[in-house]
Curated annotation (Swiss-Prot):
A zinc finger (CR-type) spans 135-213. Residues 5-70 form the J domain. The J domain is necessary and sufficient to stimulate DnaK ATPase activity. Zinc center 1 plays an important role in the autonomous, DnaK-independent chaperone activity of DnaJ. Zinc center 2 is essential for interaction with DnaK and for DnaJ activity. CXXCXGXG motif repeats lie at residues 148-155, 165-172, 187-194, 201-208. It comes from Erwinia tasmaniensis (strain DSM 17950 / CFBP 7177 / CIP 109463 / NCPPB 4357 / Et1/99). The lineage of its organism: Bacteria, Pseudomonadati, Pseudomonadota, Gammaproteobacteria, Enterobacterales. This is Chaperone protein DnaJ. The gene is dnaJ.
Length: 380
């Protein structure tokens, strides 16, 4: 039976470049791979055709011979010689094609596995609001893995050094034939590092790292808030056998303040005033992070009114304008009244015309009028 054209098998033009051929091969090989079509003889035959076409068209010399002489170039005694026949010859390595698709099967490529970078560490730092707003330097002590001072991270005893792995010759990977494919795996002798330690350091037992605690001075910039994270490069755990160290991340948590609440760059506080000041107006001393200031309260101030003190908030660590302090007035009801005070309040209430006095309590008048209308509507 006549063989099909290799370009036709892969569905590419004769002018297709290697990238297009590889793309077509990957798509078709995935579709007709024997593992996906177990027991399907037709799919197995197509897969053999696809592999054969790919092997010829990605080899410069074989492709040139095929373009000139067709299949005759690879028949016994033909121009190509070598007796190419499906899976039987050629020995092509397909792990580069499937490396991104079947990474686990083929060992993820041909790169030598490097010694592992040190792990990143996290430290939770609690700050007062004042420390967060103004900035502070704090000393912290953390347990970590540091580079061994005896072998300087190599893991080998003093006077010796790691030896090139005799199994993989420093490549970190070995090739194994599995069925139709040449599979790359991490070297079982050196575990992918490309070197072995024949005589390990007595201090770190060949790991290149030892357990220690270290003290660091951490500078917290002004304006940080809960959830902010500060990175100290290279202050994490030391890497294995001389690999780079990880980083230390300081996680900021600001304690609740007894006066202020922070919302982004603004501060909020509640300022209690008595009902006399609320009615007549006056001045009251309020706290800020910069010290005490006087707040002018106008006459007829209602509870819940916000007063903004510009520039008395927080300057964010990310820059921008400084926030404001917003004071929320809370009008306090007097308690523990004596008889004289109660009498005076009753007289004052009578002068207002009762709880629904229109002139002195406009909101109360509106409220009670609404209540009266509500009940009138119910009884109709």
């Amino acid at each position: 039976m006549a063989k099909r054209d290799y370009y036709e098998i892969l569905g590419v033009a004769k002018s297709a470049d290697e990238r297009e051929i590889k793309k077509a091969y990957k798509r078709l090989a995935m579709k007709f791979h024997p593992d996906r079509n177990q027991g399907d003889k037709e799919s197995e035959g197509k897969f053999k055709e696809i592999k054969e076409a790919y092997e010829i068209l990605t080899d410069g010399q074989k492709r040139a011979a095929y373009d000139q002489y067709g299949h005759a170039a690879f028949e016994q005694g033909g121009m190509g010689g070598g007796g190419h026949g499906g899976f039987g010859g050629g020995g092509a390595d397909f792990s580069d094609i499937f490396g991104d698709v079947f990474g686990d099967i083929f060992g993820g490529g041909r790169r030598q596995q490097r010694a592992a970078r040190g792990a990143d560490l996290r430290y939770n730092m609690e700050l007062t609001l004042e420390e967060a707003v103004r900035g502070v330097s704090k000393e912290i002590r953390i347990p970590t893995l540091e580079e061994c001072g005896v072998c300087h991270g190599s893991g080998a005893k003093a006077g010796t050094k790691p030896q090139t792995c005799s199994t993989c010759h420093g490549a970190g990977q070995v090739q194994m034939r599995q069925g139709f494919f040449t599979v790359q795996q991490a070297c079982p002798t050196c575990h992918g590092r490309g070197s072995v330690i024949k005589d390990p350091c007595n201090a770190c037992h060949g790991h290149g790292r030892v357990e220690k605690s270290k003290t660091l001075s951490v500078k917290i910039p002004a304006g940080v808030d809960t959830g902010d994270r500060i990175r100290l490069s290279g202050e994490g755990e030391a890497g294995e056998q001389g690999a780079p160290a990880g980083d230390l991340y300081v996680q900021v948590q600001v304690r609740k303040h007894h006066i202020f609440e922070r919302e982004e760059n603004n501060l909020y506080c509640e300022v209690p005033i008595n009902f006399v000041m609320a009615a007549l107006g006056g001045e009251i001393e309020v706290p800020t992070l910069d010290g005490r200031v006087n707040l002018k309260v106008p006459a007829e101030t209602q509870t819940g009114k916000l007063f903004r003190m510009r520039g008395k908030g927080v300057k964010s660590v990310r820059g921008g304008a400084q926030g404001d302090l917003l004071c929320r007035v809370v009008v306090e009801t007097p308690v523990s009244l004596n008889e004289k005070q109660k009498t005076l309040l009753r007289e004052l209430d009578e002068s207002f015309g009762g709880p629904s006095g229109e002139k002195n309590s406009p909101r109360s008048k509106t409220f009670f009028d609404g209540v009266k209308k509500f009940f009138d509507d119910l009884t109709r």
